C-alpha cells in the first residue's frame, strides 16, 4: 500500500448527511416561501372582499336613485 486509505463508508455517510441537510434546507425555504405567500394573500383577499362589498353597496344605491328618479310622482 502506498499509505493512502480511502474511507468509503465515511465518504458515503458524509455525502448522505450533506444531501439530507440540503434537502431539509430546501424544505425550509419552500415552507418559508409558502408562509410568506399566505401572509401576503390574506390581507389581499380581505381587501378584495371589502372592495366587492363596496361596489355592491354603491350599485344598490345607484339603482335606488335611478328607480326613485323614474318612478311616477304622486
From Swiss-Prot:
Q: Which UniProt keywords apply?
A: Bacteriochlorophyll, Chlorophyll, Chlorosome, Chromophore, Photosynthesis, Repeat
The UniProt PTM text for this protein says: A short form lacking first Ser is produced.
Chain residue ranges for the region called 4 X approximate repeats: 7-60
Compartments annotated for it: namely:
Chlorosome, Chlorosome envelope
Q: Which GO terms describe its cellular component?
A: chlorosome envelope
User: What GO terms describe the biological role, i.e. biological process, of this protein?
Assistant: photosynthesis
- In this UniProt entry, the residues modified to Blocked amino end (Asn) are 2
GO MF annotations in UniProt: bacteriochlorophyll binding
Q: What is its main location?
A: other
Where would I find the sequence repeats?
7-16, 28-38, 39-49, 50-60
- Role of this protein: Component of the photosynthetic apparatus which may bind the chlorosome to the bacteriochlorophyll a protein monolayer.
Q: Which family does it belong to?
A: Belongs to the CsmB/CsmF family.
Indicate what this protein is called per its UniProt record.
Chlorosome envelope protein B
The scientific name of the source species is Chlorobaculum thiosulfatiphilum (Chlorobium limicola f.sp. thiosulfatophilum)
Q: Which gene encodes it?
A: csmB
Amino acid at each position: 500500500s502506498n499509505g493512502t486509505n480511502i474511507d468509503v463508508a465515511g465518504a458515503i455517510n458524509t455525502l448522505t448527511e450533506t444531501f439530507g441537510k440540503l434537502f431539509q434546507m430546501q424544505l425550509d425555504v419552500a415552507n418559508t416561501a409558502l408562509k410568506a405567500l399566505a401572509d401576503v394573500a390574506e390581507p389581499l383577499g380581505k381587501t378584495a372582499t371589502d372592495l366587492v362589498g363596496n361596489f355592491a353597496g354603491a350599485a344598490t344605491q345607484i339603482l335606488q336613485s335611478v328607480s326613485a328618479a323614474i318612478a311616477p310622482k304622486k
